[in-house]
Regions:
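N-terminal secretory signal peptides that target proteins for export/translocation
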Residues: 1-10
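A cross-kingdom marker for long, charged
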Residues: 242-299
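A conditional alpha-helix N-cap/helix-loop micro-motif detector
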Residues: 33, 64, 249-253
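Alpha-helical scaffolding within the catalytic cores
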Residues: 35-39, 255-256
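Bacterial N-terminal signal peptides
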Residues: 13-26
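Structured, acidic catalytic/metal-binding patches in enzyme active sites
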Residues: 39-244, 248
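Boundary at the C-terminal end of the N-terminal hydrophobic targeting segment
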Residues: 28-32
Length: 299
């Protein structure tokens, strides 16, 4: 299966799916310093107890949420857990609030009657009342529509947060909810509307996109995840694609690499981020290596 976006709006769908999902084969023969494969990495530096960096997929698929034994062992041994954001009740409330407009605008007035009616029809079929849809930001409606119907389970990141709290581990965040939601709020109204239009047009292939990402993730194939992301941008507006990839992936990689330094200096940490952030020339594995850490693939 090879799903290839063909419109400017599709780059948003693919990149957002990759970013939000990120997002079991054997790789014993892959070179450890290539960073092309593997989800769990030991991070070491002289004089500090080693820590672990784990690539997640923001999915409730049973094959994703059940931690493999090496990952579970690293998690259990950690003195604290660091996620992209702390998923406590207040953060979840903030995320939910960020989906809605509070300036008096209504979705219909921003996107027009025809697109609004199509959005409401699909949302209603999924059990979401128009009263709620009417106050959504255009990007928020699109992101919700990207979630397959029935995909309402607890995703891996929430499992890690829940288990850390249950085990009495301190939980840290590399980013704030405001920073993550700001990635979408910063999109122009034109781009938000294009995203919503293209999401509605491509509802039938979003499931296929997610399936392809899931296969790459369960194969621990970081190189393939990068290829899927890069393929999504080939036929898209170059400036639009570059800007979105820079903001959603690259800039966040540098920010997270810097912010995890205090955790790594403490040692015995379990740090979990979307798997797409691990690989590539500007991925976290390469950035940590350049800072003098030794990275060893564990799983």
């Amino acid at each position: 299966m090879n799903v290839k976006p063909s419109t400017q709006g599709s780059v948003f769908i693919w990149n957002i799916i990759v970013a939000l999902t990120c997002l079991a084969g054997a790789f014993a023969t892959a070179a450890a310093d290539s960073f092309d494969a593997g989800l769990l990495w030991r991070v070491e530096r002289a004089g500090v107890t080693s820590s672990y960096l784990f690539g997640t997929m923001h999915s409730d698929d049973p094959g994703v949420v059940k931690l493999p034994k090496p990952v579970q062992r690293a998690f259990d041994q950690a003195q604290s857990v660091t996620l992209e954001v702390v998923l406590d009740p207040q953060s979840l409330l903030t995320m939910t609030s960020a989906l809605l407009m509070t300036d008096g605008n209504k979705l219909e007035s921003l996107i027009g009657r025809q697109l609004y009616e199509r959005t409401v029809a699909v949302m209603s079929a999924r059990g979401m009342p128009e009263l709620l849809v009417a106050n959504m930001k255009p990007w928020a409606a699109a992101v919700i529509l990207m979630t397959p119907p029935g995909n309402n389970g607890v995703v891996l990141d929430h499992v890690l947060y829940r288990d850390a709290v249950a085990a009495g581990k301190k939980v840290h965040g590399l980013e704030t909810v405001a920073e993550q939601m700001g990635l979408f709020d910063d999109l122009s109204r034109k781009d938000q509307i294009a995203l919503l239009e293209d999401t509605l047009k491509n509802l039938d292939i979003i499931g296929q996109m997610l399936d392809e990402l899931l296969v790459a993730y369960l194969d621990r194939d970081l190189k393939r995840l990068l290829e899927l992301n890069e393929a999504s941008m080939r036929d898209s507006d170059p400036q639009l694609a570059e800007t979105f990839n820079r903001k959603v992936i690259v800039e966040r990689n540098y920010r997270m690499a810097e912010r995890m330094q205090s955790r790594l200096r403490e040692g015995q940490q379990f740090i979990a981020v979307g798997a797409l952030h691990l690989a590539g020339e500007q991925g976290l594995l390469k950035l940590l290596s350049e800072r003098g850490y030794r990275l060893s693939r564990i799983y």
